[in-house]
Amino acid sequence: MIFMEVTLAIVKPDGVKRGLIGEILKRYENKGLRLKAAKVVTPSIELLEKHYEEHKGKPFFKPLIEYMSSGPVFAMVLEGENAVKLVRMINGATKVEDALPGTIRGDFASSTTYNVVHGSDSVESAKREIALWFPELIL
């Protein structure tokens, strides 16, 4: 079944620093996703703690927050058929050793932390994350 969805994707600081925004956006658009909203921002620790709240207390939480707040990110809302699943497929596996060539992470990630991109993991997460990153956007 086909569902028109919106999802949040983020080019993380390592991807922005390496000039990968255009290549990543092209990969999403080539699969039929449309850019609905986008911004370059250096996220606050407060925003990131809300975004990653399900990981609070895990050993990687603090390093993840520090990394994600270390520089600008390119946050975007993408729209399309089965957008959540499609973005995750294009991104590739979270763990760099599991990411296949041809995926964003398979081609560009240097570690599981420095894995270039974020994509919402469910429709519910997408709604919550978009509300955090784009509070001005009415969906």
Swiss-Prot record:
Record bears the keyword Ribosomal protein: no
Which UniProt keywords are given for this protein, alphabetically ordered? Answer: ATP-binding, Cytoplasm, Kinase, Magnesium, Metal-binding, Nucleotide metabolism, Nucleotide-binding, Phosphoprotein, Transferase
* Subcellular location field: Cytoplasm
Question: Which reaction is recorded as catalysed by this protein?
Answer: a 2'-deoxyribonucleoside 5'-diphosphate + ATP = a 2'-deoxyribonucleoside 5'-triphosphate + ADP; a ribonucleoside 5'-diphosphate + ATP = a ribonucleoside 5'-triphosphate + ADP
Name the enzyme's class.
transferase
Query: Which InterPro entries does its entry note?
Result: NDK-like_dom (IPR034907), NDK-like_dom_sf (IPR036850), Nucleoside_diP_kinase (IPR001564), Nucleoside_diP_kinase_AS (IPR023005)
Could you tell me one molecular function GO term of this UniProt entry?
A: nucleoside diphosphate kinase activity
Q: How does it assemble?
A: Homotetramer.
Location (main, coarse) = cytoplasm
Provide the GO biological process annotations.
CTP biosynthetic process; GTP biosynthetic process; UTP biosynthetic process
Q: Which organism is it from?
A: Caldanaerobacter subterraneus subsp. tengcongensis (strain DSM 15242 / JCM 11007 / NBRC 100824 / MB4)
Q: What is this protein called?
A: Nucleoside diphosphate kinase
NCBIfam families referenced in this protein's UniProt entry, alphabetically: PRK00668.1
Q: What's one GO-annotated cellular component?
A: cytoplasm
UniProt lists the family membership as follows: Belongs to the NDK family.
- rRNA processing is among the record's keywords: no
Active-site residues annotated for this sequence: 118 (pros-phosphohistidine intermediate)
Q: What's the EC number here?
A: 2.7.4.6
Q: Which cofactors are reported in the record for this sequence? A: Mg(2+)
